[in-house]
Structures are given as structure tokens and as C-alpha cells.
């Protein structure tokens, strides 16, 4: 993925409340149920940083996130890097109330080129991952609780 690429986006509307959606994307215990089961801690606070490992197809990817902006129940933004690999991105989550439901729009913008010739760093893999997380996994998690 290159910084000249347009952002990867995913969006979904959920039958839940803003507070429930905010909690699902900012509470580590809840994030483990739909997002990354190895994330051990998370705080929606500017400057908070977490590193956790994710294994994919026998390869270990140490995820490093740093929160750069958090507006309660409205906006969450963090940098996303993989320790040991070139490249960086910013993940932005925008929440909004839509009648009796709430919407989430996610944007993943590459800010430094991912240069490793791995399938996990291809745009299609990233698009598929965000589609799965936002449109399937989070939706199922929120609407079954």
C-alpha cells in the first residue's frame, strides 16, 4: 500500500446506541470479541499507545497503535504501524446517530508506504479486512448482545 493510494473505507449502520458502539471500539475487553483477540489494553485518550501481536498465515505482525485524537462518542483516530516493517497508516472512526440506529465510517489512510512484498500489505487484503471487521464481525457482535 502506498501513501498515494486513496484511503480504504468501510461503513455500516447498527441497531444500537452511540454509547454501545463507542464502548465496542474503545474497550479492550469488547474489542477482543470482534476485532483483535490479542489486544490487551486500549484507551481512547490522545497519546495512548499499545503494541500487540497478531499472527497471520504463520507470520507475526506486531501492531503498534497510538491514539492521536479522541472525541467521546464521535471520533477516534490512531496511527497504525507494524514493528519490524516499513509503513504506517492512520485509522479514523467516525460515529453518527441515524434515527434509531448509529453509523460508523472507517477510513484507513496510508501515510508511509508499506514496502514489504507480503500479501498482508496488499490493498485488497486490507480492504477485505476492514470490510470483514466493520460490516460483518462488529455488526454481528453488536446485534447479538
Residue spans for each PLM region:
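Short, charged low-complexity linear motifs
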Residues: 7-8, 19-20, 63-66, 106-118
Amino acid at each position: 500500500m502506498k501513501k498515494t493510494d486513496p484511503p480504504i473505507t468501510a461503513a455500516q449502520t447498527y441497531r444500537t446506541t452511540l454509547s454501545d458502539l463507542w464502548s465496542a471500539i474503545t474497550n479492550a475487553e469488547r474489542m477482543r470479541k470482534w476485532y483483535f483477540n490479542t489486544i490487551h489494553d486500549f484507551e481512547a485518550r490522545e497519546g495512548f499507545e499499545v503494541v500487540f501481536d497478531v499472527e497471520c498465515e504463520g507470520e507475526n505482525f506486531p501492531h503498534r497503535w497510538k491514539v492521536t485524537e479522541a472525541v467521546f462518542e464521535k471520533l477516534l483516530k490512531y496511527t497504525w504501524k507494524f514493528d519490524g516493517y516499513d509503513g504506517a497508516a492512520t485509522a479514523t472512526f467516525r460515529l453518527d446517530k441515524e434515527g434509531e440506529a448509529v453509523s460508523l465510517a472507517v477510513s484507513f489512510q496510508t501515510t508511509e508506504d508499506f514496502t514489504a512484498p507480503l500479501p498482508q500489505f496488499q490493498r485488497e487484503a486490507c480492504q477485505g479486512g476492514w470490510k470483514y471487521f466493520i460490516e460483518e464481525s462488529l455488526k454481528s457482535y453488536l446485534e447479538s448482545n
